[in-house]
A protein has these predicted regions:
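Cys/His-rich short segments
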Residues: 1-21
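Conserved beta-strand segments that form the floor/walls of ligand-binding pockets within enzyme
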Residues: 2, 29, 41, 89-91
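Conserved active-site beta-strand-loop modules that form the wall/rim of enzyme catalytic pockets
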Residues: 17-32, 37-44, 54, 71
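The catalytic Nudix box helix
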Residues: 42-76, 90
Length: 157
């Protein structure tokens, strides 16, 4: 942004955050946060300095639900202008054990929910709701960009 008076250029700080749809067959991992938002949500969190967004996906799912994931697929992004955030939506698959070990400091609920039992948020504005709706309607496509790296096993697990 350029000031019209002094012509000083200021670059806004944008904070990347991920929203993660973790898939386990015909079930999706849904959460509810301990405070604030009262509707179903997906795993979410901010990218740390020096971390790729794919590493953020793995770390946040492990921190909030105690689950390993793989087959990370970028879906799409959504700006969240009032908070200077850019939300990056990903789908991924549970890797191995699907037993949830919920972070009770952050979440009050985390569970695998069958496709036909998913209750969507009111309104159509959020990337989270769009991703839950895609899964509920069995419209998650597997053609989204898949992250692969020879170092996948060395990433946060």
């Amino acid at each position: 942004m350029v000031c019209p008076e002094c012509h000083n250029t200021v670059y806004p700080r944008i904070m990347p955050a991920v929203i993660v749809g973790v898939i386990n067959g015909d079930k999706l991992l849904l959460t509810k946060y301990r405070t604030g938002f009262k509707y179903n949500a997906l795993i979410a969190g901010f990218t740390e300095i020096g971390e790729t967004v794919e590493e953020t996906v793995k770390r946040e799912v492990m921190e909030e639900a105690g689950i390993k994931v793989n087959n990370i697929r970028y879906y799409k992004s959504q700006p969240w202008g009032s908070a200077n955030d850019i939300l990056l939506g990903f789908f991924c698959d549970v890797k191995g054990n699907d037993e949830i070990s919920m972070d009770t400091n952050e979440l009050k609920y985390a569970d695998w929910v069958q496709r036909d039992e998913i209750i969507l948020q009111p309104g159509e504005f959020s990337l989270t709701n769009e991703m839950m709706k895609l899964f509920k309607e069995n419209k998650v496509e597997w053609k989204y960009h898949t992250h692969s790296s020879k170092n996948d096993e060395d990433m946060v697990q």
